[in-house]
Amino acid sequence: GVGFKAGVKDYRLTYYTPEYKTKDTDILAAFRMTPQPGVPAEERGAAVAAESSTGTWTTVQTDGLTSLDRYKGRCYDIEPVAGEENQYIAYVAYPLDLFEEGSVTNMLTSIVGNVFGFKALRALXXEDLRIPPAYSKTFIGPPHGIQVERDKLNKYGRPLLGCTIKPKLGLSAKNYGRAVYECLRGGLDFTKDDENVNSQPFMRWRDRFLFVAEALFKSQAETGEIKGHYLNATAGTCEEMMKRAVFARELGVPIVMHDYLTGGFTANTSLAFYCRDNGLLLHIHRAMHAVIDRPRNHGIHFRVLAKALRMSGGDHIHAGTVVGKLEGEREVTLGFVDLLRDDYIEKDRSRGIYFTQDWVSMPGVLPVASGGIHVWHMPALTEIFGDDSVLQFGGGTLGHPWGNAPGAVANRVALEACVQARNEGRDLAREGNEIIREASK
């Protein structure tokens, strides 16, 4: 007789295993599935598990040469999404052996690489991943982490202040350096290259690096505080990116920056290794994230991209602002902020956290609040994000009617006032505006 039967077969026979007990070493994923009408949810969940692990659409001769039971992804639970017609959360467990050690690139290729174009699904969204310690221990993670960064900068007990230099495109290197100096001299801890400032005709990277370094050292000498500017090392090739990081180190600056999604996880992990070996902090911008995470029913939720970044490596990452958004958003944002900086995060569906995540002492990442915030948001930001955060005001610094340095002074004064008021037990939510008004005198 024949060894196996060819032909299209039901996935759920092999890949839907509701009796499966998940292992501590499994990578677990939660997918939000919107099936095409008329397709049973179990079959869809099983299909997702199969296509992102060992399955293909038919039985193949080589299946006989391996142990499917050892290597297959399993859909072990399916629950309907409350309040949504025809939408389910499918839980899939992947055996650890399916993944290359220390490669975020391979992890994402495996889990979300192919299955999102699946005809039988109208939409699919990876909501969360549980990274087991057995896997996370194969990554270096953030080059330094929150505690080491505070020690390097000698700044404690308050959020850090940043500012993106605007106009982001068109300034010459010397004028750019001047804006950096004014902001740092006024009281900010950091200034920042915009994510799309790389090396353009109006300002080549090397000139910018030189003038910025001069601004850093001058402001440091005058304020007696350690200052930084996120020099964007993102480039068209990995070699060029490393060249820029090396030059930053030679100048003796404390921090460089990378656009991790457009630059890619492979480049990002290389840069993180270099930063750890050479004492550079690494600021991460998430340009392109909304392309991937904005649709609610399709794509990858930002909490997954955030976990991936913590594994790949970065000391700061942009994480939204929360201010002025809906309450529900606030809880979800704080969920992934905790996933970035805490060591142990309990499962909590109200905050979008589908799995308990234990990072087993991998360093944390500072969340950066940036985009459309200004000095009147300071009380809310201090309360929501707490001390371990970077608050970045671009237009909210440079837009000050008296100029850049007074804008920086205003932000620093407001921050110190809010931190002091909080430490004295005042209610920032209620008295915020009053606190800012008093401080501005």
From Swiss-Prot:
**What positions does the entry give for Mg(2+) binding?**
192, 194-195
Name of the gene this protein is made from = rbcL
Q: How is it modified after translation?
A: The disulfide bond which can form in the large chain dimeric partners within the hexadecamer appears to be associated with oxidative stress and protein turnover.
The cofactor(s) it depends on are: Mg(2+)
* N6-carboxylysine carried by residues: 192
Coiled-coil spans in chain: none
InterPro entries attached to this UniProt entry? RuBisCO (IPR033966), RuBisCo_large_chain_AS (IPR020878), RuBisCO_lsu_C (IPR000685), RuBisCO_lsu_C_sf (IPR036376), RuBisCO_lsu_fd_N (IPR017443), RuBisCO_lsu_N_sf (IPR036422), RuBisCO_lsuI (IPR020888)
Q: Name one Pfam family in it.
A: RuBisCO_large_N
Q: How does it assemble?
A: Heterohexadecamer of 8 large chains and 8 small chains; disulfide-linked. The disulfide link is formed within the large subunit homodimers.
Give the enzyme's main class according to its UniProt record, as a single word: lyase
- Reactions listed under catalytic activity: 2 (2R)-3-phosphoglycerate + 2 H(+) = D-ribulose 1,5-bisphosphate + CO2 + H2O; D-ribulose 1,5-bisphosphate + O2 = 2-phosphoglycolate + (2R)-3-phosphoglycerate + 2 H(+)
Q: By what name is this protein known?
A: Ribulose bisphosphate carboxylase large chain
User: GO cellular-component terms in the record?
Assistant: chloroplast
Provide one Gene Ontology biological process annotation.
photorespiration
Q: Where does substrate bind?
A: 114, 164, 168, 286, 318, 370
Q: What else is known?
A: The basic functional RuBisCO is composed of a large chain homodimer in a 'head-to-tail' conformation. In form I RuBisCO this homodimer is arranged in a barrel-like tetramer with the small subunits forming a tetrameric 'cap' on each end of the 'barrel'.
- PROSITE patterns tied to this protein: RUBISCO_LARGE
Q: Which PANTHER family match?
A: RIBULOSE BISPHOSPHATE CARBOXYLASE, RIBULOSE BISPHOSPHATE CARBOXYLASE LARGE CHAIN
Q: What EC number(s) are associated with this protein in UniProt?
A: 4.1.1.39
Keywords noted in UniProt: Calvin cycle, Carbon dioxide fixation, Chloroplast, Disulfide bond, Lyase, Magnesium, Metal-binding, Methylation, Monooxygenase, Oxidoreductase, Photorespiration, Photosynthesis, Plastid
